Amino acid sequence: MKRAFMSETAIVRTLAPSIAGVGLFIFVVLTLANATDGDSGMSAGACAVSAMSPIIIMNSLAGYDNQNGWERYRATLPFSRKDIICARYLCTVVFSIVMACAATLLNILALPLFDPMGIPSTCQTIFEIATASAASMLISLMMVFLAQPLFFRFGHMEALRLSVGLFALLGCLTMAALSSSNPISNWLMSIAGGNPDPAVLGCLCAGIAVLALALCAISCTVSTKVYRVRDL
């Protein structure tokens, strides 16, 4: 499985510059556009990057499988199909965490620039930004885990047609329900209360992480079963 994971990371490294460029553009635009909305608006850029990263990485890796017959060639390498599945899930999670951490760090470094707008650079603000970014990433990962078996069962293009509706529907429902440019942050704050305790936010984030981990295990098991019987 280690060799399969190294193979996946090598692919992601070739895609990293373009993914990072898109992420940086979205971060700058959303941060500047929503900075006047207070703490939740200030974290909009970091949350958006954290949420989009798992989806972009999943689609990028699935798309690479179809290039130059890589998926069929990989089947001839000394990797079991279970190793390939586990490596794909692990790679998606690891690079999603890296992107979320980078976005959060950029957001924290940018805080002093927005002091004139009434956004203080306090530990509470930093913790809320980090928690909202982590929650955004975890919720996005859960959507990825729901869609990932489709990619291993039907291939990239067919699965993309099937899953894009899922992502669009969930995104529209979330935005409509919360009426916010940063729904995850506002959702966390509404549960935690007007003056959220860091312990409460931490517990909420930990609960989401447990759900994501359970869904990851189920999704990985399903993907392994469907990929083993798939004719490459």
Q: What residue ranges belong to the model's regions?
A:
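Hydrophobic alpha-helical transmembrane segments of membrane proteins
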Residues: 1-69, 87-232
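Short helix-to-coil transition segments within interhelical loops
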Residues: 75-81
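Alpha-helix N-cap/helix-start motif at helix boundaries, enriched for small hydrophobics
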Residues: 83-85
